[in-house]
Amino acid sequence: MILGPDGILNRDTRGDWVRLRTLILLRWMAVAGQLAAIVVTDWYLGVRLPMGLCFMAVGASVIANVIATFVFPQNRRLTEFQALMILLFDLTQLSFLLFLTGGLTNPFALLILAPVTISALALELRTTVILGAIAIGLLTFTAYFHLPLILADGSSLSVPRMFEFGFWLAIVIGILFLGLYSRRVAIEIRSMSDALLATQMALDREQKLTDLGGVVAAAAHELGTPLATIKLVSSELAEELSEQPALRDDAELIREQADRCRDILRSMGRAGKDDLQMRQAPLGEVLREAAEPHVGRGKRVEFDLYPSRGGDERQPVILRRPEVIHGLRNLIQNAVDFARSTVWIDGEWTGDRIAIRIVDDGEGYPPAIIGRIGDPFVRQRRAEESQSRRPGYEGMGLGLFIAKTLLERSGAELSFANAADPFLRSHERPERCGAIVEVIWPVDRLVVVRNAPLGENVLIQT
C-alpha cells in the first residue's frame, strides 16, 4: 500500500492499478469486432474495401497482443505512461481503419470513444486530457482525409456536409461528456473505496485491541502462579543468605522484579479483561467510555440521560460493540474539536428506540456542505481555521465518514443539523448553538435481551 498526502492511497499511482491482461482482453474483443465488420461489409454488403490494408491494420493489433501475451506476465501492472502508450496505439490503429473505410461516413467511427472512456476510468486527468485531445485531432483528420467507400455499383458513398459535421460534433461532444462523466464516477468510486478501507482499518484496529486485552488477561492469570513461586523462593534465599550481602541483594532484587511483573500484569489484566459480562454495559457507561479520551481536552463535556415517553426509568443495557464505541468517539472528537467551551451528550430511550444527540456550542456545520456530511474527503473547514483548532488536521471529512459507516453498520440512522442559524449574532445565539448529530437505533439492534445467553459454551478440559 502506498501512502500519500492526498489520502489512503496516493493518487499519482492510479495507473499502477491497470492490468496489462485487461487491456489485452479488450483489444482481442476489438480485433474480433473489426474483422467481423470488415468481412461482412465486403462480402455481404458488397462494399469494396482495401482489404490488404485493412487486414494489415488489424494484424498490427494481433501482433501487439501476441507479443504482450508471451513477453510480459499476465499479472503485469502498467504505469501511467505505459497505459497511455497502449491506448494511444489502439486509438491510432482505429483512426487508420477509419481512414481506409470512409472516415466519418463509417458509422463505426463512434468506437473512437472507447479508449478515451477507458482512460477516464483508469488513468489520471492529465493522461485523459492528452488522449482526448489526440482523439479529437485524429477524428478531425479523418473527416477531411480518408478513402471513400466504393459501393457494389462502383459509385462512392457520400453524405451531405451538414450530416458529416453533425456526426463529427456528436462524437466530439461524446468524447467530452463521457470523459468527464466517467472521470467523475471513477473519482467517486475511488474515494469511497479509500474511505471504506480506512473504516475497515479503524475497526480492525479496535478489534485487535480488544483481542489483545483478552490475551493479556489470560497471560496475567497464567503467569500468576510462576511469579508467586519466584517470589517465595527469592524470599527464602534472601533469608538464608543473610551472611552473604551480595547474594542476598540479588535475591531481593529478584523478588522486587517479580512484584513489579505482578503489578504490571494485574493492571493490564484489569484493562483488557475479556469477560463476557463486560461486553454489555448501561447506556451511560458506554457513552462515557466513548468520550473518555476527549473529556480532559479543555472543553466541558456534559451528559444527560433520560427516558422518553413510554421508556423504562432504568437505563437500557446495551452491547459494547467496537463499531459503536469507535463511531461515537469520532463524533464526540469532532464536537470537542470545534466547540467553544461545552459539548452536550444526550441519551434518550423509549420502548422501541434509543437516540443519542451530540451538540456543541461552536460555529456549526457550513451551510454549503451540510447535505454532504458523511461523504468521504469533504473539506469542512477552511485550512487556517482547521489548523488553529486541530493542528495537523486536513479536514477531509474522513473521521465523520468512518463514524457514519461504523454506526450505520450497527443499525443506526444518523442525521446532521445546526442548532441555530449560523448567521445570527453571537448575543442572539442560544447556549446550544453549534452542530448537532443525532444517532438513532431500533432497540432490538442495540439493547441486550434479558436472559439471553452471553455466548457459546466453552469446553472445560480436565
Swiss-Prot record:
Q: Which residues lie on this side of the membrane: Cytoplasmic?
A: 1-25, 71-78, 124-129, 183-462
Gene3D superfamilies the UniProt entry points to: 1.10.287.130, Histidine kinase-like ATPase, C-terminal domain (3.30.565.10)
Q: What is its EC number?
A: 2.7.13.3
Kindly indicate whether the keyword Oxidoreductase belongs to this entry.
no
Q: GO molecular function of the protein, one example? A: ATP binding
Native organism? Cereibacter sphaeroides (strain ATCC 17023 / DSM 158 / JCM 6121 / CCUG 31486 / LMG 2827 / NBRC 12203 / NCIMB 8253 / ATH 2.4.1.) (Rhodobacter sphaeroides)
Q: Which PANTHER family match?
A: SENSOR PROTEIN CREC, SENSOR PROTEIN RSTB
Task: Tell me the protein's name.
Answer: Sensor histidine kinase RegB
Q: Which residues form the Histidine kinase domain?
A: 218-445
> Which of the residues are on side Extracellular?
46-51, 97-103, 150-164
Q: Which residues cross the membrane?
A: 26-45, 52-70, 79-96, 104-123, 130-149, 165-182
Q: What is the lineage of its organism?
A: Bacteria, Pseudomonadati, Pseudomonadota, Alphaproteobacteria, Rhodobacterales
Q: Give the record's membrane topology.
A: Multi-pass membrane protein
Q: Which reaction does it catalyse?
A: ATP + protein L-histidine = ADP + protein N-phospho-L-histidine
Q: What does the function comment of this entry state? A: Member of the two-component regulatory system RegB/RegA. Involved in the positive regulation of photosynthesis gene expression in response to anaerobiosis. Also involved in positive regulation of the cbbI and cbbII Calvin cycle CO2 fixation operons, as well as in regulation of expression of genes involved in alternative CO2 fixation pathways. Phosphorylates RegA/PrrA.
Where Phosphohistidine occurs, the residues are 221
Per the record, the major location class is: membrane
User: Which Gene Ontology terms of cellular component type are present?
Assistant: plasma membrane
Among SUPFAM superfamilies, the record links this protein to: ATPase domain of HSP90 chaperone/DNA topoisomerase II/histidine kinase, Homodimeric domain of signal transducing histidine kinase
Q: Establish whether keyword Cell inner membrane is in the entry.
A: yes
